Structures are given as C-alpha cells and as structure tokens.
Amino acid sequence: MTVAPGETRRRADVVVIVGELPRIHHSLVGELAGTVPDLSTVNQRAFFVVGPNGMSVPPLNGGREATRLSCGQASLAATLAALRTQYKGRRTSQPVSNFNDFAKALAAARFPVFLFSGHAAEGLALEMLQGLIADLNRNSRASGLHLPANENGWGSTLASAWMTGFPLRTGFARGFPEFDPWRCDVARMIAAGEADLHLRISAATAQPKEKKRRMALIALTKTQEPVAGAAVTIAIGEAGLDHDAVVYSSRTGSLRSTEAQAASQLPSAATIIRLIASHAFAEPLPC
C-alpha cells in the first residue's frame, strides 16, 4: 500500500494531501500539479486536502486549489475516521465536506495516492489513514507516500530497521533488540533521572536543557567551541558536507551516495563512535 515518489509523479491521477506537509515537500506538490500522469483519462490530476479548516496547504501551480475534505475544526484523526466511515456508507455525527466530489474522483481514479507525514499526523491519524487505504484496496487500488519531516531522521530509522528489525527507540539492555517507544524514549529517561550519561550526536549545535543531577553529557557536534554544560565536546563533520556519505533522499524514496560539498578534516560521527567503542568494549562492534 506504499508507493515510491517516482511512481507517484508518473501515475497518480488523484492526489490526497493528508494534514500539513513539511515545507521541504511543497515543491513536490507543485510539481505534481504542473504535470500530467500517464494513467489519467482527463489529462489532469485531481487534488484533495484532508484537515481542519484553516490548515495551510502547499500551493498548486496555475492558481489551482485543492478540494477541502474537513469536518469543520475537528482533528485530522477525527476527519479521517469520518471519511473512512462515509466511504463505507455509514452515518457520521458530522459529514465530511465535499465528500461526494471525493467519492466520484475515487470511482474514476486509476491510481490515487495519499501524501502524508508524521510531522503533523499523530499515531491515531496514521492508523485511520492506513485503514482507509486498506478499505480502498478491497475494491480498487490506492497507495500512500510517506514524506518525512527530516531526511536524516528517516534514514536513521531505516538503518535501525535493517540492523535490528525495529525502528528507533530500541534498547539492548537484555542482550537483544527490544522495541519499546515509551521505555526507550531518551527525553523521558533523562527527565526521570534514569540515565547517568547522555551521548548526543547532532550536526547542529544546540544548547542542552537544564543539566540533570548525576548525568554527564558527551556532545558530538559540528562546532568550534565547547558545548555549554557538556563534560566532553568532540567536533564532527556534517554528512554530505564535510565528508562523503550515504543519505536518504525523499525525491527518490531511497538511500543515495553523496560526495562532500566542502571536504574538511573533521571526522564523521561513525568514526568517533567506533573509537569510543574500541576503548569501552573488549569485543569489536559489528559493521
């Protein structure tokens, strides 16, 4: 039920924007509005947007506007639930605006695609969206295209998934990977005093919040000055800028290699972590 960005550009004849999308993806929406899919029977894509009234919508080329699907000021999750309910022919406490236009477009569609991001959609909204797409696939075809708010963050999630079988917030305290998004929430662990050492890795320098008692901070970041409050600061390079890297690309929906734009002598985060691990553990780390 997922689709690649390239397939969306080529085939999507109905595009449904679910919630607010990060600004880095607004150009994709404009590109979709300015091109014609090869499966369209009317030589034009139909655009809908799901969300409360007043929600910002990426601009479409040619002065076009997306048809709003909303339940007034109801939340995104509630609107998706109502949309799913109406699609099944059941009654709702508040109908979705322009639902008949949406139903007609889906009936004629050959390749509808829902654009979404975890940036503005919480868990229940994403669950309702997946349910709606599953319902549509029982009789026709529909797909979802995930547009991450942060490409580096999503790349890290994919790397965690292929190495452990789970996304981030996975722990190894018992010798094997355990996915627990609540227990392994770093911010919660620090606030609760469960941690006595915080290793922070970030290309952007950020001042830490109020220092917690008994917790030391080791900061790996691109900086020329020590990070305030850190016991140790180690300068690292930025992937794709200071050194060659493999990064996630939303445009292709996959990983790609990139050369350093301004190569420097700053080491990569992976190099520093491996050096730390070589002194902290008797056995070498896996690749």
Would you name each region that the model predicts?
Residues 1-141, 171-287:
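Non-catalytic alpha/beta scaffold blocks inside enzyme catalytic domains
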Residues 1, 79-80, 142-168:
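Short connector loops at secondary-structure junctions
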